[in-house]
């Protein structure tokens, strides 16, 4: 979490409403708490908040004509190898419902940061593929994959099939120009 010593006074911090009761954040300047369906806008950017299928929320940031989506824990989280068929269906339904909700607002995304988590077992890329299949995504950056770098790399041909550039940031300090 962001501690007061890390809080830069001329910046705004946007957190999910569920974090508003944390003692570590109380009294810090420039904090905005948002929930699914809410947004924040200033003279430089707009942040739309969407849901998650686990903890927190997901964010769509629009700035300088670019849209950047950070999925947080939004994903088709199911462990088919361990879950019942009903649990798999529930996870799939929750995830696809959130994508449907998002499609009412989002037409295209320049950069999407999205989980490709090999801990899910054989379906670990399913949510990511459903995501790039639903939205016109220019660049896909996987997250939640370390240390399974090769598993994350396996998504590159899927992204390409949807006309999406795949960028793997696998080491500390890696960056990409948008």
How should each PLM-predicted stretch be described?
Residues 1-8:
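Short, small-residue-biased leader/transition segments that mark boundaries at the very start
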Residues 4, 13-19, 69-72, 89-91, ...:
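Active-site neighborhood of phospho(di)ester-bond hydrolases with catalytic His/Asp-centered motifs
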Residues 5, 102-103, 131-134:
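A general structural signal for stabilizing positions within well-ordered secondary structure
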Residues 18-20, 51-55, 118-121, 146-148:
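Short beta->alpha connector loops
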Residues 27-40, 120, 124-178:
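Binuclear metal-ion centers of metallo-dependent hydrolases, dominated by the metallo-beta-lactamase
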Residues 30-108, 171-178:
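Core dinuclear metal-dependent hydrolase active-site scaffold
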Residues 85-91, 111-133:
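Active-site-proximal segments of metal-dependent phosphoesterases and phosphodiesterases across multiple
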């Amino acid at each position: 979490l962001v501690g007061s010593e890390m809080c830069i006074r001329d910046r705004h911090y946007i957190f999910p409403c569920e974090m508003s009761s944390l003692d570590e954040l109380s009294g810090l300047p420039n904090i905005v708490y948002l929930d699914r369906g809410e947004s924040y806008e200033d003279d430089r950017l707009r942040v739309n908040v969407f849901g998650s299928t686990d903890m927190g929320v997901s964010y769509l940031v629009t700035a300088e004509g670019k849209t950047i989506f950070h999925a947080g824990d939004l994903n088709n989280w199911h462990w088919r190898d361990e879950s019942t068929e009903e649990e798999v269906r529930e996870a799939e339904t929750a995830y696809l419902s959130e994508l449907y909700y998002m499609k009412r607002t989002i037409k295209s995304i320049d950069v999407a940061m999205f989980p490709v988590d090999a801990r899910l077992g054989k379906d670990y890329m399913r949510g990511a593929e459903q995501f790039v299949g639903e939205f016109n995504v220019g660049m896909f950056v996987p997250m939640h994959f370390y240390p399974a770098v090769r598993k994350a790399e396996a998504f590159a041909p899927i992204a390409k099939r949807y006309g999406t550039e795949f960028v793997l940031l696998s080491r500390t300090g890696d960056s990409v120009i948008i």
